[in-house]
Amino acid sequence: MVALLPGLAALLAGCNEDTVEKQIGSATAASVEATYRVNRDPLLNDWNQDVGRTLTAFSVRQQVPYKFKVVDTDMVNAFAAPWGYVYVTQGFLDFADSEDEVVAVLGHEIGHVVHRDGIKAFKQSILFNLAAGLIGSQSETLGEVTAVGLGLLSLHYSREQEYAADDTGTAMAYAAGYDPQGLLGFFAKLHTDLEKGQSSSYLEALLSTHPYTPNRRDRQAAQPWVMAATAPSAMRIAQGYLGRGQYGRALALLNAKAAQEPDNQQLALMLADALAGRGSESEARGRYQMASAQGAPSYPNYALAQMTKNPVPVSVPPTAGEQAQALALVGSAEALVTGTQDTQTRLAAAQEAMAPKLQAARGDSAAAMGLLQRLSEVETELPKQTQKIAININAAVAAAADVVYTLDRCQEQSVTAVQNNAEVGRQATVLLRSLSQGGSRSGALKLAQSAVYELGKSNELLLAASEAARAAVGPTQEAQMSARQTSMYVERLFDRQRVRQSDLTLAQMLTRETRERAQAANKQAQEAQNRARLATVRGMLAVLQLAHAAAPAEMLPGLDRMVAHYLRTGTGQVAALRDRGFGYGDIAVMVAAARGSGTAIGLEADRMGAGIAPLEVVDLKRDGSNGLKVMVKFLSKAMAQEVALPGQASNPAG
C-alpha cells in the first residue's frame, strides 16, 4: 500500500471524511481541467447541467455540490472525481445513441459519488499522494497537475462497486422520468463491439476502468423499474416521454398496460394526453369524454377546452406547381443516392489503405498505455524527482494515445455517416416521388429539397475528412512509436535500485519528443475529425428536414415540443419559426448559433432568411459544432421514432 506523505498525514489529521473528499475532489477536478479542454458550448452545457440536476435531486448525498462537464477527448469515457465532479467525454457523447443512454451512465457515475467509490480508489493509489501535493501547493510542474486528472481515468472499480453504481444509475433515471433501459442500450453497444473481437482503441479506457460483463446487463434487465413491469412503473417512464414530446414512445408503454388495468383512470388520461400530442384528436377527445363521464371531470374538461381552443393543423395537399418541381427533383435525389454509394466505396478503399499503419499505431499505443495502469496500481513511494518524471511520461503517452482515439473515431463516424446518408437519400427519393403524385402535403417540397442539399454537402465533407485522415496516419504512427519507446523507461523508474541519473535525463528527452510528436499529429487528426463531425451534423440535419416534411400537419405541434426540449428553448419559439417556413434542422442551427453568440433566436432567423442553408451562413466555433452534433443526434433519432419516414416499413413508435 502507498505510504502517505507527511503533508498528507497532516492534512488528514482531525478532518472528517467529507472534508478530505472535498479537498481531494477539488484538486482532482483542477487536474482534469488542466489536462483536457472543457467544452464551453452553452447549448450542450445547459442540457448536461439540467440532466445532472434532475438526477441528483434523487441522490441520498444532498450535501455534495454536483457539477457536470464535458471534456474534449475522443476517448469514450465517463468518470466522477470525489465530491461530485462528474465528467463525460466528447467521445462518449458521440458514441451514445440516445439521451436515455447518457442519463443512465450519468446516474451510474453519480452512484460512484454516492458510494464514495472514487475516494476509496484514490486511497489505494499513488494519486492520493499527488493530489495531496496539489492541495498543499507542493506542485511545481504542469505534469504533476495533469497526472492526477489522467490517473482518475485509470482508477479501477470492483465488480460490486459497478453493480451498485448500475443500480443507482437506473433507479435515478427511473425516478427522474427517463427510461432506465438506456443503460441496457449502452451495454448492447459495448457488447456488439466486444463480439466483433476487435474493441476499438477509444473504448479501452472505459472497458478498463468500468469492466463490462453480460452479468451487468442481465442484472439490470431483471430490475422491475428497468423493464417497466408494472403499470405504475410504465406510467412514470411514459410521463417523462410526454414531457419531452415523445408521444409515440409514451403510447407504446401505456397501451401495453391498458389492457391489464382497464379501470386505471390515471393511465387512461395519460393515454389521452399521448394521443392528443400525436395529433390523434378524435380518439383523444373520446378518451377525455369517457374519463369525464366516469366522475373525474376537472382535468378532462380542461383538456377538451384546450383542444377546442387550439385545434390541430390540417394537412393541405401539394399544389400542382409543387408536384411538378418534386418530379424534376427526383432525378437529383437518385443521383445523390448513386453518389453516396460511390462515396462509400471510396471511403472503404481509403480506410483499407490506411489500415496497416493505423493498426501498428494502435499496437504501439496499447503497449505504451500500460503505463497508466502501472501508475494507478503502484505500491511504493517514489523519490520526488522520479515521481515527477513518471508523471510527465504519463501525460505525454496519454496525449499520443488521444491521437489514435481521434483517428479511430473519425473512421467509425465516417462509416456510420455515409451509411445513414445512403438510407436518408433513398427516403428523400421516395418522398419526392410521392409529392410528384399528389401525396404528402404542401410545404414538404422545400424541406425535402433542403434534405437532399445537406446530404450532398455531408458526402463532400466525408471525402475531405478521409483525405485529412490519410495525411494524419504517418505522424500518428510516429507519435505512438515515440510513446512506446518512452514508456520502456517506466520499469527502470519504478526500480529504485537500478535507476540512474542518465536514465532520468534520457526519459525527460524522450518525453519531450513524444509530447511534440503527439501535438503535431493531433493537429492533423483533429482536422479530419472536425470534418467528419460536421459531415455527421449535416446528415442529421437532413434527417430532421425530411422527418419534418414527412410528418402529417396534425403532428407538428407535438414535434415542436420535442424540438424545444432538445434545443432548450420554448415550444412557442419553435412553432413561430416553423410558421415562418423554417425546417426543424434549420431551427436547430439557429438556436445553437444564437446560444453561442448570445443573440436572440429571432435575429439569427432574420439574418439567415428562409431558403438559405443555415450552415452556409453560420460560423459555428468548434464547441458549437460539437454541441450541435450531440443535440441534433438525439433529436433526429427521437423524431425518426415518432414519424414514419418515407420507405420505412412502419412507425417504430407505434
Predicted features by range, described:
Residues 1-7:
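Sec-dependent N-terminal signal peptides
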Residues 309-539:
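Extended amphipathic alpha-helical heptad-repeat regions
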Residues 245-246, 279, 321, 363, ...:
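Short helix-adjacent coil turns
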Residues 2, 12-314, 318:
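A Zn2+-metalloprotease active-site environment signal
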Residues 211-232, 293-338, 515, 519-527, ...:
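Pro/Ala/Gly-rich low-complexity, hydrophilic intrinsically disordered segments
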Residues 19-28, 122-156, 198-204, 333, ...:
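Glycine- and small hydrophobic-rich membrane-insertion segments that are intrinsically disordered
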Residues 502-506, 510, 519-654:
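General marker for long, soluble alpha-helical cores
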